Amino acid sequence: SDPEAPGIWFGPRL
């Protein structure tokens, strides 16, 4: 549950 996780910001976010 890391808000800075690349899978969260650079994954589905794109």
UniProtKB/Swiss-Prot annotation:
It comes from the Eukaryota. Expressed in the brain, subesophageal ganglion and in the retrocerebral complex (mainly corpora allata). Belongs to the pyrokinin family. InterPro entries: Pyrokinin_CS. The keyword Cytoplasm does not apply. This is Pyrokinin-6. Its main location: secreted. Myoactive. It comes from Pseudoderopeltis foveolata (Cockroach). The modification Leucine amide is found at residue 14. GO terms for biological process: neuropeptide signaling pathway. The keyword Transcription regulation does not apply. GO terms for molecular function: neuropeptide hormone activity. Keywords: Amidation, Neuropeptide, Secreted. GO terms for cellular component: extracellular region. It is found in: Secreted. Coiled coil: none annotated.
